[in-house]
Amino acid sequence: MNLKTQRLELIPLLPYQLRAWVEDRNALERELDCTYQAEPLEGVFLEIVKGQLAITEQHPEEYLWHSFWFLVRQSDRVVVGSADFKDVPDARQEVEIGYGLGKAFEHQGYMTEAVQAMCDWALAQENVAHILAETERDGWASQRILQRCGFREDKRGETIWWKL
């Protein structure tokens, strides 16, 4: 189940594809006919992906809520970024979204396109009423993405929580 925007194809990675991203990116690129140029899969980001991989493998039927979605530019099949829902919708019918973009692709509107499409899809599901996002207090670019997608500031502390 892929989503398409004006410039992007959003591909939610199946559990075995998420594992391939961690273990054999070249094989995944061949399978998806793409070239990965998004944020480097290392450090804290790699640990986050591995954590989501474990959950996705335990609950493959809910992979759309746990796996990462590749943001593939349609014109040349370059993966410019990734995004994910961090868990299944909770009892309040809320789900959190996270996202990251390769540095070379910042400030071109790709993430706004992707976040809007993913939020539209999520809100069309019967168990989702709201989408949450967390940004750093100085994460101006990320905050602008959320504002363009209709999010409003919900709580402010060490970080800022947003709600759609």
Regions found by a protein language model. Give the residues of each.
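GNAT-family acyltransferases
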Residues: 1-96, 101-104, 117-121, 125, ...
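Glycine-rich acyl-CoA binding loop
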Residues: 107-112
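Conserved active-site tyrosine of GNAT-family acetyltransferases
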Residues: 146
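Short acidic/polar active-site loop segments enriched in Thr and Asp
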Residues: 129
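Conserved beta-strand-loop-alpha-helix junction that forms the acyl-donor binding cleft
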Residues: 133-143
